[in-house]
Amino acid sequence: SIDNYFFITAKCNSNCIMCPSPDNSRKNGGSSSIENLIEVAKHIPADTPHLTITGGEPFMVGEKLFKFILFLKEKFENTEFLFLTNGRIFALDSYVKQLKACIPENSVIGIPIHGSTAEIHDGITQTVNSFYQTISGVKKLLRENLKIEIRIVISKLNAEDIGNIAKMIVESMQGISHVSIIAMEMTGSAYVH
């Protein structure tokens, strides 16, 4: 396949109301071992054009994920990578430093912002302080000159806030690679809400 995904874990430290994964998966889901992920990656041709790292929240498996990322960097020198994360873990300087040290050159980090305020963002993630952690993580990654895509999933809870989100990005997140506006997938929690 020209487009391959590594699903690291179903677990997530947010509980987004529109998440396509069921609540039980996010709370109790399993994770792939790093060794198994490396074994699978060995069977993908080195010239594959694109790889996505996703989850749940892939960084929920902890710092051992960096071993896998380094393996990918060494094997897939010309591959484009997309890392899908809620970005909260990058409020921690240690995670920013480790990612910077091992991330492949042709990488984009896709991070969702659900609102221009903590009230809206945290209301959608159902997680207190997720707004501040996400914004902090984005800004720290930008300071390291990493390529960031902001993802905005539109729902009735943030549709009226799109202009404010755009203003926030323009005013306080210079260096963003691009912004993607995404429709909700009507499965999992999104179907319920």
Model-derived segments and spans:
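A short acidic, helix-capping loop that chelates divalent metal ions and anchors anionic groups
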Residues: 27, 117-124, 187-192
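Conserved C-terminal portion of the radical SAM core fold
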Residues: 51, 107-108, 133-193
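A structural signal for short coil/turn segments at secondary-structure junctions
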Residues: 44-48, 76, 103, 145, ...
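Canonical radical SAM enzyme core domain
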Residues: 25-38, 58-102, 113-117, 127-133, ...
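Conserved beta-strand positions
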Residues: 53-55, 85, 111, 181
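Conserved phosphate-donor/acceptor-positioning beta-strand/loop module used by diverse small-molecule
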Residues: 12, 111-113
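Short Fe-S-cluster ligation motifs
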Residues: 39-58
